[in-house]
């Protein structure tokens, strides 16, 4: 791999005096990207191979080159407004990524400056309130960014597509049909014709790095940047930042969720209708996401395993949907 990376880095550096591939990151991820921590000429970088067939999930299609260019443009925009987004490096031709063919796959190679920091995944009221302030700052700045490349698609459209995928396999399973009916109810409750689309990036805890002073030091995600309804995006963040036992846990805390809204100063932008939507948006974000759909399709032929799986996500949905009604 070192030789392959060195061949690509010739497009970025006039001279390469030293190169070390220090670590392969996020192995065996669903998106088939390759990600390495490297050191070139004594400086650390993130070397990312983004698969040309990459998709966030089947509901939203593949990530095109045009979208990737626009995503990088948005990161520059945020950096211009003093948001600590990871710095992307253009190649010597001035392009934001380099096209690479390897092992019968096509990739977009993106080189970024490495950021040292800590992921905080066990959320506390103080940390979450601090990040709520940061998220509000980012969203307010993002309101002025306009794009003709990104599509304005509601998360609800994605959930409907997931429902269609499940319904095609659910005819013989009573428990799954009941679950689908519950999901449809939440989609209906979360619907509004008054969407406020702003460009957002995925600010989940694994994409945010903190410094020793408990301040946000860096944001590293960029390939999920797109238009998102502001309230739908806010519900997505509350799902993540209400977790007190780590990102693999379904344990959430209403006090922590409320602390996020306090930091975000949500009271001065949310309408009564937005608060009504939150309960169902939270349910959908945790209990009808791509991980749920993928697992459901994988166990659908095993009745017992399917029932146990649905119960886990049914309980999760109940916890999420009651987060803000318990405060």
Predicted regions and their residues:
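Conserved NTP-binding catalytic cores of kinases and kinase-like/nucleotidyltransferase enzymes
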Residues: 1-89, 211-212, 327
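An alpha-helical support segment within catalytic cores of ATP-dependent transferases
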Residues: 9-13, 147-148, 159-201, 211-214
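Active-site acidic catalytic loop and adjacent metal/ATP-binding pocket
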Residues: 31-42, 46-48, 185-232
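Conserved structural core of kinase catalytic domains
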Residues: 93-127
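Conserved kinase catalytic-core helix
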Residues: 115-150
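Active-site activation/catalytic loop segments of kinase-like enzymes and analogous catalytic loops
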Residues: 231-269, 284-300
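All-alpha amphipathic helical-bundle segments outside canonical DNA-binding/catalytic cores
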Residues: 270-282
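ATP/Mg2+ or Mg2+-diphosphate-binding catalytic cores
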Residues: 289-327
């Amino acid at each position: 791999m070192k030789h392959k990376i060195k061949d690509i880095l010739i497009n970025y550096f006039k001279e390469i005096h030293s190169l070390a591939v220090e670590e392969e990151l996020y192995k065996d991820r669903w998106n088939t990207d390759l990600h390495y921590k490297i050191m070139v000429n004594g400086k650390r970088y993130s070397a990312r191979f983004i698969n040309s067939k990459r998709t966030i999930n089947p509901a939203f299609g593949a990530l095109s080159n045009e979208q990737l260019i626009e995503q990088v443009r948005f990161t520059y925009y945020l950096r211009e407004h003093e948001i600590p987004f990871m710095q992307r490096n253009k190649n010597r031709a001035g392009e934001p990524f380099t096209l690479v063919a390897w092992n019968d796959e096509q990739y977009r190679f993106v080189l970024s400056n490495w950021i040292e920091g800590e992921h905080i995944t066990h959320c506390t009221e103080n940390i979450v309130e601090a990040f709520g302030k940061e998220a509000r700052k980012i969203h307010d700045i993002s309101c002025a960014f306009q794009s003709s490349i990104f599509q304005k698609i509601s998360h609800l459209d994605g959930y409907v597509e997931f429902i269609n995928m499940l319904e095609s396999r659910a005819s013989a399973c009573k428990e799954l049909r009941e679950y689908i009916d519950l999901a449809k109810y939440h989609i209906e409750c979360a619907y509004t014709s008054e969407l406020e689309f702003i460009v957002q990036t995925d600010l989940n805890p694994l994409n945010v790095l903190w410094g020793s002073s408990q301040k946000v030091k860096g944001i590293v995600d960029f390939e999920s940047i797109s238009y998102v309804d502001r309230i739908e995006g806010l519900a997505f963040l509350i799902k993540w930042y209400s977790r007190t036992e780590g990102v693999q846990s379904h344990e959430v805390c209403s006090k922590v969720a409320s602390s996020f809204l306090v930091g975000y100063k949500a009271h001065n932008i949310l309408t009564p209708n937005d608060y009504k939507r939150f309960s169902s948006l939270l349910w959908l974000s945790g209990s009808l996401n791509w991980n749920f759909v993928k697992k459901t399709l994988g166990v659908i032929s095993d009745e017992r395993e399917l029932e146990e799986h649905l119960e886990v996500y049914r309980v999760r949905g109940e916890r999420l949907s009651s987060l803000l009604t318990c405060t």
